[in-house]
């Protein structure tokens, strides 16, 4: 899973030809750490890019995308945000959401 920041977000997410799942998280967030292994599995199982944005280190991105609670997972397709999942949800819910856009 790739860790990105404000400098690499446009290239890695907005200009990506692949579907991108962005995990807005922070290292002190228990639910964020809990969902991490699930995201690793999804990155291996699906034809999409999974990236993480540390909200503590990238507050401008968090503000721009209206992040109010973490983890917040956003799906981007061809540079456009197409879906958002808030919280440490079960893998089955993430899979259902991802499958809508593949």
Curated annotation (Swiss-Prot):
Q: What is this protein called?
A: Thioredoxin
This protein's source sits in the domain of life called Eukaryota
Q: Per the similarity annotation, which family is this? A: Belongs to the thioredoxin family.
Annotated CDD domains: TRX_family
Name of one Pfam family that matches: Thioredoxin
What keywords is this UniProt entry annotated with? Chloroplast, Disulfide bond, Electron transport, Plastid, Redox-active center, Transport
Where in or outside the cell it occurs: the entry states: Plastid, Chloroplast
Q: Name one GO molecular function term.
A: protein-disulfide reductase activity
Q: Which organism is it from?
A: Cyanidioschyzon merolae (strain NIES-3377 / 10D)
Residues at the site labelled Deprotonates C-terminal active site Cys: 23
Please report the stretch or stretches of sequence annotated as the Thioredoxin domain. Answer: 2-102
Q: Which residues cross the membrane?
A: none
Site described as Contributes to redox potential value, located at: 30-31
Q: List the disulfide bonds.
A: 29-32
The record's listing under InterPro entries reads:
Thioredoxin (IPR005746), Thioredoxin-like_sf (IPR036249), Thioredoxin_CS (IPR017937), Thioredoxin_domain (IPR013766)
């Amino acid at each position: 899973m790739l860790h990105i920041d404000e400098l690499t977000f446009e290239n890695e997410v907005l200009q990506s030809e692949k579907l991108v799942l962005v995990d807005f998280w922070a290292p002190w967030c228990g639910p964020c750490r809990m969902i991490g292994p699930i995201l690793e599995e999804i990155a291996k199982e699906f034809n999409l890019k999974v990236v993480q944005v540390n909200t503590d280190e990238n507050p401008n991105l968090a503000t721009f995308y209206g992040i109010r609670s973490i983890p917040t997972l956003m799906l981007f397709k061809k540079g456009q945000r197409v879906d958002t999942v808030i919280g440490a949800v079960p893998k089955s819910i993430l899979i259902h959401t991802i499958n809508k856009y593949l």
